[in-house]
């Protein structure tokens, strides 16, 4: 593989992994906290009244989140599920905290999926205390200040991920971000795109990341589509987003 191709492939995998995974990790639609909310509204229920959260409730919520995740069989032939690695706090977590996104009751993260042409997909599902909190998490995607913060964090993350022994002259330029027009998946959906220019010392190309959040009741499924050189294919992104929305509704009983 040419130096630029290898650099883009490494950056795509790093960008896909920046959402974190593992029990204590966070997703792009949640805030890191040390405690679980004392009261919750069951996923999919109206945001009225509260019920006491018990350990079995949290286990059930986690099982619901896991059931809503994308699976390898949802992707075209040739895609591969990567081994999970734990990331205590992913790039961008501080941005969501600053935006005031509420802590989740439970969440689950699928392994990163990698495909042809230096592409990757990630998926995470979060259950919020109620539908209003989940809606706030989706609406935050439309905040230009939040997107700018995430772009800065992703740029810094990728710069720190470059193997300088292999790519001594490589550069990661400042990322740009814009709102992304997405179909009306689920009860509510929103998206944005981050574009990161890279240079291996002789050639310049772009790394694209499309992030989509879809809500159903008190649950949100978040997808990221990473692609090198050209933006993610819209038809592929749409098909997988619809699959994720359908699975979220089935898992939550919406």
Residue ranges and their predicted role:
Residues 26-54:
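Extracellular mucin-like PTS domains
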Residues 81-205:
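A small/polar (G/S/T-enriched), proline-flanked helix-loop surface module common
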Residues 19-22:
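Bacterial signal peptide processing site
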Residues 1-8:
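Bacterial N-terminal signal peptides that target proteins for export
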Residues 14-17:
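C-terminal motif of bacterial Sec signal peptides marking the signal peptidase cleavage site
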Residues 59-61, 121-129, 227-234:
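Second-shell loop/turn segments in exported
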Residues 49-52, 63, 168-247, 252:
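A short, solvent-exposed beta-edge/loop patch
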